[in-house]
Amino acid sequence: MTPAIISAFASHKFLHNLSEPLRMLLAAGVQPFQIKAGEYIGREGEVANGFFLVQSGRVSITANTPNRGEVEIQQLGAGEAVGWSWLVPPHKWEFNARAIDDVAGLRFDADWLRNTCEQNHALGYQFLKQLVQTLAERLKATRHQLSQTQD
């Protein structure tokens, strides 16, 4: 792993509450990723085979609706995590994640991450705490967005 990846990994907002030993354990499974504007990181219903930490660019999280088509729920940027469906069976994307800009970041293989969290309960617990915190923040943001929507 390059020094740039180690530095980016250690400074990412999603991982800042993890202890150094747990971050280093996770670092063994991280790979850089890049995606062009307009491309999808994942699509609703597809196999969720990765977990992504955004370092630059913006990602639109959308849902497919019967009456309105693809509707944006929120936008995520640097310091945010994308993709939690890898954790929950049947391991399929629940939402779409599309790059608004060119996006760069770090990616974990879903199988590797599930296995690593199962083998190291301390890591699994800390990772889940951070993931639940992230989901709670997103739910609050979605609630706020819905309260601002006028039909």
Language model segments and positions:
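Cytosolic regulatory regions built on CNB/CRP/Popeye-like sensor folds
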Residues: M1-D151
